[in-house]
Amino acid sequence: MKNLLLILIGAVLVNNFVLARFLGLCPFLGVSRKVETALGMGMAVTFVMVVASGCTWVLQYLVLTPYHLDYLQTIAFILVIATLVQMVEMIVRKSSPVLYQSLGIFLPLITTNCAVLGLAVLNIQQGYSFVQSLVFAFGGAVGFTLALVLFAGLRERLRLCPVPAAFRGTPIELITAGLLALAFMGFAGLVPG
């Protein structure tokens, strides 16, 4: 149980996919204009990450490894992730058309979100069990959502601030993202090793 808690805390705070591993930067910069949109994207990515983690773990250890098909890992994982994203897209379109509209192109782009594929590959590289991989996926997704929502909140506040002309737009947003990443570095001592 302690091991699972360390995996969870490590994935959320210490090894945050966006702020420490620099995975998933496209949606981080593209969807984080409003907190509501960021939260919706975070929930969609959370669902995809957790389910993809379970599916790719099963695929790896029941199909790819036993039949010595490890060289197909990347393409097989992408196919699983693409299928899940299509399912999420259909669900969001039916249940929340406003959220679907606000996410725009970024919802289908979850398929190519390197955080989702990176998570699946990291699960295998770390040698996690099925339960550990699900906990790692949930922690990674919560960390992704946390970074997305925090950055969206900061961007909303920045719109109200008098920013010098040279820093308006992307420059101040990248500086803010860097400061947020520095803040998350403060969690580095939480998880040993």
Swiss-Prot record:
Membrane topology of the entry: Multi-pass membrane protein
Subcellular location: Cell inner membrane
Alphabetical UniProt keywords: Cell inner membrane, Cell membrane, Electron transport, Membrane, Translocase, Transmembrane, Transmembrane helix, Transport
TM annotation in the entry: 4-24, 39-59, 72-92, 102-122, 134-154, 171-191
Keyword Transmembrane helix recorded: yes
Biological process per Gene Ontology, one example term: electron transport chain
Assembly notes: The complex is composed of six subunits: RnfA, RnfB, RnfC, RnfD, RnfE and RnfG.
Protein name: Ion-translocating oxidoreductase complex subunit A
Organism the protein comes from: Syntrophotalea carbinolica (strain DSM 2380 / NBRC 103641 / GraBd1)
